[in-house]
């Protein structure tokens, strides 16, 4: 926890503060949680009160939370992310507000050595929103199968997978509210 407080700053006529809470926690076997929440009282807080360039150029303060489970074959996580955007005082230099993730669900699977093959799964479901842009949901699924073959002097690993992505959009200005893409992927990794 980090907190700064400047009571009744005469230059602006109000209290000014900055708060940063960062916490990583091992909950139970395989489960972890993480928080990174930051806030500033006003857009000019760092420009007025910091002497470090890294602080004075800060524009987005994260508000990020994640709950994760993992074992030797699976990882599952759920995450929410938004930002406090500190605007430039010059109205011609407005800073674009980033998208919020509410929530982002992730499932990764890996089963090496399954009858000689390695099975993998990457999947993600994300609800993203923005106050003035297209909002929506993205689904990504990428299962793959690879078959590593090696001897003392070389290796060859063919891999076959299918990458599927679906977007379901609202407030979409292009007209299409549902977009999908599926692509088979084949690769070979080899070496001596």
What are these regions (language model features)?
Residues 1-192:
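Outer-membrane beta-barrel proteins and related beta-barrel translocases across Gram-negative bacteria
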């Amino acid at each position: 926890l980090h907190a700064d407080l400047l009571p009744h700053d005469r230059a602006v006529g109000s209290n000014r503060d900055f708060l940063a809470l960062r916490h990583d926690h091992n909950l139970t076997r395989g489960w972890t949680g993480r928080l990174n929440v930051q806030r500033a009282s006003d857009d000019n807080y760092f420009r007025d009160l910091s002497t470090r360039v890294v602080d004075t150029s800060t524009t987005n303060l994260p508000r990020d939370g994640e709950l994760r489970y993992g074992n030797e074959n699976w990882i599952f996580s759920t995450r929410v992310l938004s930002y406090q955007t500190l605007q430039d005082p010059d109205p011609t230099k407005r800073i674009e507000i980033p998208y919020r993730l509410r929530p982002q669900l992730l499932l990764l699977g890996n089963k090496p050595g399954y009858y000689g093959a390695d099975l993998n799964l990457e999947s993600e479901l994300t609800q993203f929103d923005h106050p003035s842009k297209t909002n929506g949901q993205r689904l990504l699924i990428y299962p793959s199968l690879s078959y590593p073959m090696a001897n003392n002097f070389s290796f060859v690993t063919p891999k076959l997978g299918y990458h599927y992505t679906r977007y379901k959009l609202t407030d979409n200005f292009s007209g299409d509210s549902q977009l999908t893409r599926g692509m088979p992927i084949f690769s070979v990794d080899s070496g001596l």
